Design a protein with these regions (language model features):
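Catalytic cores of the polymerase beta-like nucleotidyltransferase superfamily
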Residues: 1-449
């Protein structure tokens, strides 16, 4: 907690105490404190004073903001603190937002904590005394590394909690209690908005050391199919043992995910990089064949693109992110193929030129190799690719033929102009000098005329 925010929380607590109430730190802050982790999320809950009294207190301490005054949630401008009053929720439908909320300042800590999702998130700490209030055994579950729901009725009303269970399990390397798994199997996730699904997935992909746990736990809860069907379809898809000692495509994907997590901080687009790990072998679902005892997945990187597109468009509207992942997934086999062939500079230049982020393509090919088991990363290939990326960047920094050069030479823009520019760009990738490239391009344009 930032010291400035802590001091303000203490001021609020002191004013509330003067009115006969108590102020508690709640939720993730208390959990992280007991885990020895730093938490930027500061949530306090005010008990024992009426909403109007709390509003007067906040007005006296700063500029009050209302994040949801009708259900007792406030803030103070300039401070990163969420200030809430105890409340109860009643489901009015099947959706994540289908709830009626009732503010009750005198609900008591037990009932207030009962609405939380997991025991490790249901603990409270008195801001002034430091006393920990733990009605549901959160500290013990924290020690054991177990995620356990607090209340089966309220847990089952909110399907997002299934994803949160998998997300927390991945982030903290916790197990999920058997009774929570059983309850989660009965819940319907189809009513969730894709933004909520993506939010939990993003946390698992970017914060977990082993993001594979997210999908493994979703599978254990029988909840992969609604949002992650293509991952279920990877289970049992065979791979040649010579190249994939780790087993089927599901096992490989899980290992690539955890390998990618080791490299994601180096990627220009960490979320896109991790999503690529999820989807990169979807093409094997439709391309894998077995002939004379040999398993093949010819051209799976490109054949999988429709499945990748379908998967991504289900969970996000971010076109730039979708474009990045589709590009990286479709090219992920090329770096090691070209390195193995010791391909010429034009071939590697063309590969990098077709990549949205060339460095991330190399990085992902490394993660893919790591996902095949120990010894699959070949240092000589890595060096080859990095040297060729340097060469590509050098090539692209050289003068090249532009549209203005062609117009100056007498060409007029028309239907074939883009084809002519593409020809000149191909010469640039071949490291042909600008003068020579211009001459060859004009000759090509004459042949097209």
């Amino acid at each position: 907690m930032e010291n400035r925010d802590l001091k303000m929380a203490e001021k609020i607590a002191a004013c509330v105490a003067d009115k006969g109430g108590r102020t508690f730190l709640v939720g993730g802050y208390v959990r992280d404190l007991l885990m020895g982790k730093h938490s930027k999320d500061i949530d306090i809950e005010i008990h024992g004073v009426q909403p109007k009294e709390l509003e007067n207190i906040l007005d006296g301490l700063g500029s009050r903001t209302e994040m949801g005054a009708s259900f007792g949630v406030y803030g103070l401008r300039g401070y990163d603190i969420d200030i809430a009053m105890p409340r109860q929720e009643e489901a009015t439908g099947r959706g994540h937002k289908d709830f009626k909320i009732y503010v009750d300042p005198f609900l008591g800590t037990y009932k207030a904590a009962m609405r939380r999702d997991f025991t490790i998130n249901a603990m409270m700490q008195d801001v002034l005394t430091g006393e920990i209030i733990d009605h549901f055994g959160g500290q013990e579950d924290l020690k054991k590394g177990v995620l356990r729901h607090v209340n089966p009725h309220t847990f089952a009303e909110d399907p997002l909690r299934v994803l949160r269970a998998a997300q927390f399990a991945a982030r903290f390397s916790f197990s999920i209690a058997p009774e929570t798994i059983e309850l989660s199997r009965t819940m319907d996730l189809t009513t969730l908005a894709h933004e909520r699904v993506m939010s939990e997935l993003e946390k698992a992909l970017l914060k977990a050391a082993h993001p594979s746990i997210f999908f493994e736990q979703m599978h254990k809860m029988n909840q992969l199919d609604d949002w992650f069907l293509h991952l279920t379809q990877l289970i049992g898809v065979k791979q040649p043992k010579k190249y994939h000692p780790e087993g089927d495509v599901w096992n490989h994907t899980m290992q690539v995910l955890d390998s990618a997590a080791l490299l994601r901080s180096k990627a220009e687009n960490p979320l896109g990089f991790m999503l690529t790990a999820v989807v990169h072998d979807f093409g094997k679902i439709i391309s894998t064949t077995e002939e004379n005892g040999e398993i093949h997945s010819y051209d799976h990187a490109k054949k999988g693109d429709p499945l990748v597109k379908e998967f991504l468009e289900r969970i996000t509207n971010e076109t730039k992110l979708i474009r990045y992942v589709r590009n990286l997934a479709s090219l992920h086999m090329r770096p090691y193929e070209l390195a193995r062939e010791q391909a010429g500079k034009k071939a590697t230049n063309q590969m990098f030129d077709s990549a949205t982020v060339p460095y991330d393509l190399i990085l992902f090919s490394t993660a893919d190799q790591m996902g095949k088991g120990k010894g699959q990363v070949i240092p000589e290939y890595e060096d080859f690719l990095k040297e060729r990326l340097d060469w590509y960047q050098y090539t692209m920094a050289q003068p090249c033929v532009m549209g203005a050069d062609l117009i100056k030479a007498g060409l007029k823009p028309g239907p074939k102009f883009s084809e002519i520019l593409a020809y000149s760009h191909d010469l640039h990738l071949s490291n042909v000098s600008k003068d020579e490239a211009l001459a060859q391009t004009l000759s090509f344009a004459q042949r097209l005329a």
